[in-house]
From Swiss-Prot:
TM annotation in the entry: none
Any one GO MF annotation of this record: structural constituent of ribosome
Biological processes annotated in GO: translation
The organism of origin for this protein: Arthrobacter sp. (strain FB24)
Stated family: Belongs to the bacterial ribosomal protein bL28 family.
Pfam families hit by this protein: Ribosomal_L28 (PF00830)
Region entry Disordered, spans: 1-31
Database matches in InterPro entries: Ribosomal_bL28 (IPR026569), Ribosomal_bL28/bL31-like_sf (IPR034704), Ribosomal_bL28_bact-type (IPR001383), Ribosomal_bL28_sf (IPR037147)
The protein, known as: Large ribosomal subunit protein bL28
Keywords: Ribonucleoprotein, Ribosomal protein
GO cellular component, one term: ribosome
Native organism taxonomy: Bacteria, Bacillati, Actinomycetota, Actinomycetes, Micrococcales
Disulfide linkage: none
């Protein structure tokens, strides 16, 4: 599963793991991606989205219809 949120666009960040002796190792900071299924009344069907935890909160606040309309306007197939 790609570490990419369909709602917020969150992608992995890159940085370093730093040990006690301050040696640096490259690492990747992945967003908290969850696979969630939502019922979308305007489409009258279920839609499965890969969303971050922040994306889930965005859906709770704005509503699934508004969020799905924005995703479809970007040309993403659901």
């Amino acid at each position: 599963m790609a570490a990419h949120c369909q709602v917020t666009g969150a992608e992995p960040g890159f940085g370093h793991s730093i040990s006690h002796s301050h040696r640096r190792n490259k690492r990747r900071f992945d967003p908290n991606i969850q696979k969630k299924r939502y019922w979308v009344p305007s489409l009258r069907r279920n839609v499965t989205l890969q969303v971050s935890a922040r994306g889930i909160k965005t859906i709770d606040v704005r509503g699934i219809d508004v969020v799905v309309a924005a995703i479809l306007a970007r040309g993403v197939k659901l």
